[in-house]
Amino acid sequence: MQKYALQPSGFITKREAPPESAVYMHQVVAGTARYRYTTGNKVGICPQQKPVGFAPIFDMYGVMCLKQAEESVLASLNSGCSGMGRTETAPQQASFPVILMDELGFMEAEAEHFFRTVCALFSNPRYYIIGTVKPRGTRFLPVLEQMPEAAVFHLTLQNRDELYAQLERAQNFPAFLHTVGERQ
């Protein structure tokens, strides 16, 4: 992210070690994570059996993180990067705003407001979004795969090194997406 001057805003999730095994959502603003551990951002638990998500927390805190990320990206687009969206190439030295969604998966399954907010952001061509999505069994991946403008990378142990090498060789982030997207 530093190479391309990406300034992600959005969220990351972090699983705590046992015995708690709680999962917390942490807001990211302009590339800086704001770590806090409260019931207000505890989005689930991961016992040894099946993960359990807390839909009301995703619907409140998760949506708030995404709305603030969108505001941050819009502010960046309106100052300095005016008019730049997914279809245009950013200068390498320009700060490039990105919405970050770390690990969309099973825990969000019942969070309808969160799901609709994520899908609305996915479908907006003004934004670059970097997200990790579970490969199967979630509602997010089928939505992404139906969007012609989405570049979905199925990162595996077999292709990870080559994708990282392509990212290193690219002149800028949009060029990387264009190059790799043609091969998908």
Residue ranges and their predicted role:
Residues P8-S9, F96-V98, Y128-I130:
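Residue-level preference for the first positions of well-ordered beta-strands
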Residues Q2-Q49:
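N-terminal phosphate/diphosphate-binding loop that engages ATP/GTP or pyrophosphate donors
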Residues P8-G10, L100, V152-H154:
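Conserved beta-strand scaffold positions in the cores of enzyme catalytic domains, especially
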Residues K3-Y4, Q92-Q93, N124:
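Alpha-helix C-cap/termination motif
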